[in-house]
Amino acid sequence: MANKREFPLDKTRNIGIMAHIDAGKTTTTERILYYTGKIHKIGETHEGDSQMDWMDEEKERGITITSAATTAQWKDYRINIIDTPGHVDFTIEVERSLRVLDGAVTVLDAQAGVEPQTENVWRQAETYGVPRIVFVNKMDKIGADFDKSVKSLHERLNANAHAVQMPIGSADTFEGVIDLINMVADVYDEDKLGSKWDTIPVPDEYKEEALKRRNELIEAVADVDDGIMDKYLGGEEISNDELKAAIRKATLNLEFFPVYAGSAFKNKGVQMMLDGVIDYLPSPLDVKPYVAHDPKTGDEVELMADDKKPFAALAFKIATDPFVGRLTFIRVYTGSLQSGSYVLNASKNARERVGRLLQMHANSRTEIPEVFSGDIAGAIGLKNTTTGDSLTDPDHPLILESLQVPDPVIQVSVEPKSKADRDKMDVALQKLTEEDPTFRAETNPETGQTLISGMGELHLDIMVERMKREFNVEATIGEPQVAYRETFTKEAKAQGKFVRQSGGKGQYGDVWIDFTPNEEGKGYEFEDAIVGGVVPREFIPSVDQGLQEAMKNGVLAGYPLIDVKAKLYDGSYHEVDSSEAAFKVAASLALRNAAAKAGAVILEPIMKVQVTTPEEYLGDVMGSITARRGSMEGMEDRAGAKVINSFVPLSEMFGYATTLRSSTQGRGTFTMVFDHYSPTPKSIQAEIIKKRGGEDAE
């Protein structure tokens, strides 16, 4: 028997809550769950019992790491909430959740306005075309400034954001909001945890200001809507419904961002923002079709939410759940799926059986018989599916483009304390790398040492912590190492010739390769320019393979060689002695021989670092950035503090948190995010080579 869909598609919202760390994102999500009847006790992040932050590490650090997907109900709408992390080290989680949600709420701290990580997540949301509304949170704090926060959206994000509300009071006197569309005031009763409020006419002392702001709002909407513009210029009355419809249309087109005010912690304004989610954010029917590819023909296929079409979904997160084991979070784009049925993992071309389907609520779950298009659910039983895989109807395979995964920039060695720990660690690392594609683990074949790499120190700290807590692995952690790279800066032609004659079958491979630098980020490219069969067809893939393998260990200090083009243009072979293996070796010799002539350099990751400090410490802070080989990119003022933008090599940033704390008496903060690779200065390059050589020579 077919199961019935509980909420129609137009009454479904898939949203993310995006913010800078500490802007109050988890508290905001908590309140949404509380007011939509999903939790009965409010948890505070800073007390460590928030409902969304369900991994122990998150509880300890009071930050949100994993995007848990939660289902809530507001009025007669279903809202699926993807909780996204606010810390830079977890940007992949944010990217991943942006892929599967249709709209987002950006939470700002009313004291700080737009902060560095807000800029990062905002840019990512632009990339994925996600419509947003903005919630200016923490209006109860001293120094809260709603207007300045709205202004920061224009100045720092170039966003056409406009208030649809005006706060009544701020800091201690913040008691509610005025709705500029319906021209009413929502005033809260302190004692009722925000679940009770009175909607009253706009108080007299706010009337004039509210009308002025309403007029500004209408003008802003008129700029993006011709219908409203015509009425406005003609002096005609614009109804509330017309205004809301125009705001919705412009918001869905990414031309307008409605701004709300509130205090999640003090339980004010969250319900009105929820109304905004329903009024202005898209349902799965409003978003532009999702583009997939037919693996057989390569043709593009547009997916619109429709339960009757063949099933297609994206696996966007793998989590290891203490109760049910391996849990795969999926977003369904078309069709429906019943528990117990088979799907095709089109990315791996393998059939998988879905055991059970769960609707997730932060850390409790409800089993459901079927999941429909536009929905988000957890699936149990998918053994081979990893993040970014496409799950489809076995008769209609499709590839839903996979996520772009950034390369890790930092590495540490992990040494298990005992043989038993070694076995447990292997299992732990396999599980953790499955869950998080930006986390890598590899064993150095020469030293037998295990190296883990990730997006920052916090990222690796948390992974090590999880190994200990979830898998009982006791391990010693080495000093963080930078993920250096190597590249060529000049063109160089070189021969690689491998000849071995010693009784029986010999070995013979001979190649001439022209190496040229490739554009940054383009990686390795191989070109076959052999004419007249001087290197037989069957050996050419071996040359390509030999180069790729040799490039993994670089030419200077054993770091991967990147961004190089290699053109195979000449060579020779021996009728009897030539083999694939011989040409592989010949290719690696050509690479070695080219290194000296090609101006090989070591590249280091350069981080975009933003430091916020009270003005009195500015000199010290700037001095410490310069001392770390940093280059200043500019400065701005923010809420009585100075914000310094700079680029600093990652190798110089270890331990910076401690330095900054002591030089600003704990008042300075910084964020850093990987920006680009750049050649290291000669002296530092020599040091790195010496250090690596010293290790290799032991």
From Swiss-Prot:
* Location in or out of the cell: Cytoplasm
Q: Does the keyword Cytoplasm apply?
A: yes
Please state the protein's primary subcellular location: cytoplasm
Any one Pfam family here would be: EFG_III
- Which InterPro entries does this entry report, sorted A to Z? EF-G-like_DII, EFG_II, EFG_III, EFG_III/V, EFG_IV, EFG_V, EFG_V-like, G_TR_CS
Which BP terms does GO give this entry? Answer: ribosome disassembly
The tr-type G domain covers: 10-285
> Which GO CC terms are listed, alphabetically?
cytoplasm
Q: Which CDD domains match?
A: EF-G (cd01886), EFG_III (cd16262), EFG_mtEFG1_IV (cd01434), EFG_mtEFG_C (cd03713), EFG_mtEFG_II (cd04088)
Which controlled-vocabulary keywords does the entry list?
A: Cytoplasm, Elongation factor, GTP-binding, Nucleotide-binding, Protein biosynthesis
* Residues involved in GTP binding: 19-26, 83-87, 137-140
MF annotations from Gene Ontology: GTP binding; GTPase activity; translation elongation factor activity
KW Flavoprotein (keyword) present: no
Q: Any idea what job this protein has? A: Catalyzes the GTP-dependent ribosomal translocation step during translation elongation. During this step, the ribosome changes from the pre-translocational (PRE) to the post-translocational (POST) state as the newly formed A-site-bound peptidyl-tRNA and P-site-bound deacylated tRNA move to the P and E sites, respectively. Catalyzes the coordinated movement of the two tRNA molecules, the mRNA and conformational changes in the ribosome.
Task: Tell me its family.
Answer: Belongs to the TRAFAC class translation factor GTPase superfamily. Classic translation factor GTPase family. EF-G/EF-2 subfamily.
User: Under what name is this protein listed?
Assistant: Elongation factor G
Per the UniProt record, the source organism is Lactobacillus gasseri (strain ATCC 33323 / DSM 20243 / BCRC 14619 / CIP 102991 / JCM 1131 / KCTC 3163 / NCIMB 11718 / NCTC 13722 / AM63)
**Taxonomic lineage of the native organism:** Bacteria, Bacillati, Bacillota, Bacilli, Lactobacillales
